């Protein structure tokens, strides 16, 4: 500041010195200064002048005053007035000299002023001299003034007036000039003042800026000082901490030393004791040996002769035994000879029987021919009679009316002729029908023979071991068979004779009518005769087949048949007798109907007959149910044969299956339930009308003969294609395998009731254990605090105790609370649970978040819920006698095992034979082998110190196993997560457990779960499991959690039957494949994320037929790199709604409903109802309040567990029995209302459709309202819409679906309408492996009869309705249905197309947005490329490449199996594929991405990636040209084996990439190694490499261009004529040039200025000089740019992908690279 002031002062003084101011100017300045001071007061107030300026101003003012005074003095001087003009000049000179002496400071200025005055005067004088005549007259103003001045002086000389006038004039002129000068000077002064003010302001501003900068710097310095101070403080604090830690460590070290000293002392003492004991043992052993030897010597002397006698007796016995064996062998040989003779006799008898059978067949054929001849004769007689009648009519009409009635006669002749033609046509049709019926009968007989053969084969296998049948019984049986055959023949002949007589009588009766009636009867009667003849032949065929079944089976069976004839013949006789009786009844009924129903329609007659036959078969269901399994297997095998040979066997198999209606009646339930091949599909494409008519087979029955005729004619016309069979057969085989699994499980399961009874009957041995007593320092619970919690006066009245956050307490005061029911002590510092033995009514204990180490809660029988989470427990002991515990939570403890712990109750037996009780012990020294009754095995049991240290013999009398859970007989929920479990063997003592959580432990295997038959939820995530737990007996399992384990295979799933399993999570494991999951019929959620699943084709097989799967997670698996993985999975899984966390908009509800109806729908309904009941139970009882528990909630929880136990046991028994029926209140009411429930969904839909058809009728008692409510509750629609929806579904499934599926089927079949009989047989089939009681069997049979009666009544009613409805418009409803269906299909297709278009547009917009976003981020990153991030330099020695080692150890893989089908190891991660190499569809909006590379890339080579060219901006300046000729030459470079291997291994399309890899690997060797190699060796390697790349020369084609470093070889035209030496020299030059031009810019270093069109991409010289190599794309990561790897349907895809990078996977393989990347890139 002082320097600035001094500078200002100096400048002001310099400016003031330059100024020259006169006295007048000073006056003006003063006047102006006054005015300016008044106007500039505001300025002066704001800006104060410095002192120096003020001082100068004052000096100027003083000088101006002095000048004025001097001037006035001169004017007043008298001498001057009297003197002349010259005197004045003298005075002036004098004044000048005077002033100069007085005022030396401003003398120069005064001299200047005076000189100017003189000049003016001189000029005036000149003017006066020039005009001497002119005398200025005094003005009138002057004269009076002069007069006035000098009035009295008359003598005064007035010469001064002139002078005065002149002076005045000169003064005025001077004044004017001075004014002008003053104005100019003022202007200059003003401008100068303005400039100075501006400079002053600028300097002030600079000063203020300097001040601000000073303050800022001051603050910075202060902040730096503070930071340094903070750092110093932190360092001091850290040093203090370090010193404290070191001090603590030192203290701990000292403690450890003390402990080690103590341990060494104890060890020394123990060693001394052991030495003493060893000495004692040696002495004892020596004594024992001596005693043993002495005792052995005494015993040998005493018992030697006895032993010798025993040895001799043994030898004698052995010899006797040998003699007996020889006798036995002789007897066996005799028996063998006798059996051979018997077999020879039997063979002779068989031959005789064969001859008899052939003879009978001949007789049968002869009889058949006779019957045909008789029938032909009857037909010929009828024709003759018809012709005679017609001729008689003509004769009579011509005789009576010859003339007048000619026209009428002609008309009658035409009518008669027409009748004759109609009769002929009917006869021809009947003959055709008869032939068809014969074919049908033959096939049916063959089918029955096969069935009988299989039944006899089965029975013969069972009776093979019975060899005690005598020959007499066999002969008697043969005689009885012959008699039965003869009787059957006689009966057949008699029946034929009777029927012929009846037909003759009917003919005679019909001839008595009118002529018109006779014609009608003769037209209709042959039809009836043909029907009756066909039925007769059918009966005859049945008789003959039944007679010959035994003979045919004897040919097949051979020797075993004779052994088993007794049993088989008895059963066959019973079956034959029953069949004959029933056939006779049917024949009688048919004859009566033929006599009484001649004028009825032919369809109704066959319907009645068929209904009666089916009713008879339903009554005979008990006799035939044993053959059901064989029939099922036979049909299944036939379906397979048809699948293999569809063209050859289509017609034959169709007839066989069609004609086995009688044998298939017992299996129809299963076929209808599973939508099996039989009865599900139509025969061929052209049977649309027939399919429509037979679509409602369950309510309609058509004529048998018409159906056979239609099938036979139309199937010959339209033969189906063989490839169309695969779909239906695959579905059928799938459903058959599911049912097979269910039946196999029913055979092999462990009955849960037996396990439960064994557990209940197991004796619990209680022993006293040492219990840790609480410390005396902790206080007991205060009685007053307990009583304040409720309205209680004494502790005996207390029922609930709740405390939280107590410092520490003991529960001794609770011993007086005898009525305590609810105890909650959270965070109360408890160390043990004790003193509760008197609280017998205690139900609920909540002691979470304490420090409990021991439990003492024995004999609390009412205890239900125990919550001990977050404590310090190490075992499960202390709950003995608490038999009613239902929920036990022990998470976050230190429990190590649920396994068995043993304790021995030992007794010693001394030498005298006395027994001494030693007590129990758990410490052991050695082992002894003991039989364990619980495990049914021998095991090594420890011997304790009590027995080991004794000198006597020992005896383990009782061995007790204890696991801590054996007394918990009703435990249902056990939670043991976050413990230290290594063993779970004790779970076998808890068969009632329903919920088990053992997650986050150290388990390698889960044992004891086999007995937990009611287990529904199993959580095992976070363990070390390598295999699946054994789940064979867990049929009720609903959730299985196996996340974060080491499971590598799930093949055990294929052997498990888990029909209720809904949720499976196996994420974060090492799975490379899964088994097919179709048999998990209720599976809804599957999580297999973060595994090693890579094969999409096998994944499609795994998920095939999982129709209930709604949610699937596959994130983190390599198969997501496939292009079409999403579409292929959605095709296989129609019901999928959530895929990898994204909600799908699927239009597959109709498909899922159809698939839900597939299979054993009754069983599916059972599973769904059970799951629904479990969920409803949870909703009703679990309030969802979280951790808030009260006494009411505890009681509610106990009720929930009781209900859960009842439901679980009931459903378990249902699965074990194989019962498929759903028992509900609504269904019981439905049974009362005469509508019994069936097994399948189709019957329910039939009922709903039937009810909807009868909506208009007011009285419909067959369908109750509650049943309709139950049906509508299962569907998401309202009750009013159920009828329409179910009707549409029913029509689509039963009417239209058959037409569509007829293309995929070549087996013409017909369904049997009686489905309730089927249900009874399916129930019997499910019970085949269980032996039910007599009451259950009786109930089942009664129900079957009752339901059969109901269904027969309903079918009669439905047939009436159907006939009434189909007479008028037979095909109108069917056409309407087909039209409606086509319209629906078109609408669905249009809607799907619109939705697909909309989805494509949305995806395109979304992907464009994401791409733009990524490009902006990439461009920003390019701008900020030069960041402060430091990369570690790469050691290029890591890239050393050994070609020989690569050739030796290279794995030659099949290119077809790479990369999707080759399975990696479990510890390897799958690298993401480059989408540019994959085949992607035009429909997929995917952008290919290229990986970041260390070398510079070529722009034209990577045209497919526009982003890559932007990312690598450096490559634009240094890339080489790429010509199409080089592309064609690259395609022919496949000769090198190494390049082929690399291209096959890595999947490269272009061989150039493999060459680049090899050359780059060779070039990236370190310089040190290159220096070590000799130049000749390097030259040889170079030649070898050149020879590998060289191409064969073709004479016709131009030599292809080589893009390498040695292009000059091809360009040189003299290359062909050069010798070998010149070639070597040239190669050396090129190698020298290559070695020297590898590093650096080629344009500058190349000697020949060659073209740098290099074969490989160039390495950056900066990289070779030690610069940084960017091996990872730092702009956008590859996972983000690869749009194929994640779905764009959700906006959170990018965030999810970024979260994946930070997600830690426990089993993921770490990277082996040495590079370090900054945090921004990761």
Curated annotation (Swiss-Prot):
Residues 23-47, 182-202, 265-285, 319-367, 1506-1534 are annotated as: Disordered. One of its GO terms (cellular component) is microtubule cytoskeleton. Residues 265-278 have a biased composition (Basic and acidic residues). Residues 38-47 have a biased composition (Acidic residues). Transmembrane segments: none annotated. LRR repeats lie at residues 819-840, 841-861, 862-883, 884-905, 970-991, 992-1013, 1014-1035, 1036-1057, 1060-1081, 1082-1103. Gene3D superfamilies: 1.20.5.190, Ribonuclease Inhibitor. Residues 283-312, 1335-1364, 1395-1424 form the IQ domain. PROSITE patterns: IQ, LRR. CDD domains: IQCD. This is Leucine-rich repeat- and IQ domain-containing protein 1. The lineage of its organism: Eukaryota, Metazoa, Chordata, Craniata, Vertebrata.
